[in-house]
Amino acid sequence: KIANSHATITITNHFRPDYSSCHVVDYDTITNKALKMDTHQGYSSTSAWARGQAWGLYGYTMMYRETQNEKYLQQAINIAKFILHHPNLPEDKIPYWDFDAPNIPDEPRDASAGAIIASALLELGQYVNDDKLSKEYQSVAAQQLRTLSSDEYLAAPQTNGGFILKHSVGNKPRNSEVDAPLTYADYYYVEALLRYKTVSYTHLRAHETVLDLV
């Protein structure tokens, strides 16, 4: 009940008409009224912080899995559309730390956001009834995993402090963990690899090179 309430209120108060989301919403503690949108780790209160968009996609996909409530599935589909069709999403599908960062393309990428998105898309692709959408999600996720598994992002053994992935961004406005490894980047990368390996995607197996790591 609490999770459903939180997810529904978040749709109302965190998301914009284009299905991007803000990082923080300030509430009146007496009336519970939403007072303003803000950010803590994003570029601005009106920007689309990349990992925040990834969390939203992952979260509403999970909410649909647990509840079978179609409104959560539709929310996940809408968030995926915002992410995948954003003009600032690079060709290799690993986002900049914020979709609205001011110096794109000279901004850090966030491998953690890419890993979260890939894992979410692989799950979401199983739930949608539209075969075209399912193929798009699965193909983008596979592309993200190939990118993250390249020398650009995948650390050599016994380097990178023992972490798997390079080039994540924790909190750029406060210059914390910028272009750094992050534990949760590794977690969602491994989760996405396992999902890619264990879920049967016929069109991917037929037309895409299967990742050597899986």
Language-model features: where?
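Well-ordered alpha-helical segments within folded domains of soluble proteins
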Residues: 1, 48-65, 107-126, 181-197
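Carbohydrate-binding/catalytic loop surfaces
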Residues: 18-49, 92-116, 157-181
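C-terminal hydrophobic structural anchor segments
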Residues: 115-164
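A beta-strand-loop signature enriched in Asp, Gly, Thr, and Trp
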Residues: 71-134
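Conserved small/polar residues in nucleotide/adenosyl-binding loops
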Residues: 202-209
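Long, well-ordered core segments of solenoidal/helical folds
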Residues: 2-20, 29-36, 75-92, 139-158
